[in-house]
Amino acid sequence: MCSCRKDDELIMKMTTKEYLENANAEMGRKVWEHYGEEAQTKKFVEELSELITALAREDARAIREEMADVEVMIMQFKQGLNIDTLPIMNYKLNRTMARIENEKSK
C-alpha cells in the first residue's frame, strides 16, 4: 500500500519552515554520505573564507549567500559527526550576558 496519502497529510501539517528544514537536513545527509568528511572539511574551509571576504567587503548580498553556505556546512558536520552544539551555545550566550551585565554595573 502506498503511503503517499499519509506523507501528504504529514506535509500539510508542517509549516513551510519545518518542511524546508527537514528537506535540507535530508539533502545535507546525502551530500555528507556522498563526499565524506575529508572533502567536506575542505569545502567548509572554502565557504568560511568566502564569508570572511564578504564580511570584510561589507557586501550584504554576498554575506547572505555565504552565510547560507556556511550554515549548510555546519548542518552537515553536526549531522555527520553527531555534534550537539545547543548546550554549548547556551553556555556561551549566558557567559556573554553576564559580561554585559557586569559592564553595565561599572
Mark where each language-model region is.
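Flexible "arm" and connector segments at domain edges
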Residues: 2-106
